Regions:
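Alpha-helical segment of the N-proximal tetratricopeptide repeat
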Residues: 22-53
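Conserved structural position within tetratricopeptide repeats
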Residues: 51-52, 82-86, 120
């Protein structure tokens, strides 16, 4: 049906928008599908190629870092989050995920600093701030 066709055409854009991007290309869209399937190794490979082709895309670096972190490469992930935030210091996804990394590696003050910045960027709250707040509280309870 035409409805299904339209959905299939726009679904990569909906997935990409979930990660803060409104104009994904094929590599980026493929990486997001891998991430949603928790296939982080495949996502990392695609995002490595993507960031080579689009080195100024903060969101590409963010998802590359996220995939690296999910695979246990915490030091590399930290460098990649820094790269993403150097390109766009207001990248909410990068601030959230970097904050999670800080909390995960026992640096609660840095995690709280990222949360404070997110609260400034979204005074009426946003998913990134709520997710980071929840993650920090979850770590603190352990």
């Amino acid at each position: 049906s035409i409805t299904l066709l339209i959905f299939l055409l726009i679904s990569p854009y909906l997935l990409a928008a979930k990660y803060g991007k409104t104009d994904p290309d094929k590599l980026y869209s493929r990486a997001i599908k891998f991430i949603d399937q928790e296939r982080f190794f495949e996502a990392k490979k695609v995002l490595k190629a993507y960031t080579k082709s689009k080195p100024e895309d903060s969101y590409g670096w963010t998802l590359y870092a996220f995939s690296e972190r999910k695979l246990g490469g915490l030091e590399k992930a930290e460098q990649l989050y820094e790269k993403a935030l150097t390109l766009d210091s207001n990248n909410k996804a990068a601030l959230e995920y970097q904050g999670e990394l800080f909390a995960q590696t026992n640096r609660p003050l840095l995690a709280e600093s990222n949360l404070a910045k997110l609260k400034i960027l979204c005074p009426d709250s946003c998913e990134e701030a709520e997710q980071l707040d929840s993650f920090i509280k979850g770590i603190a309870e352990k």
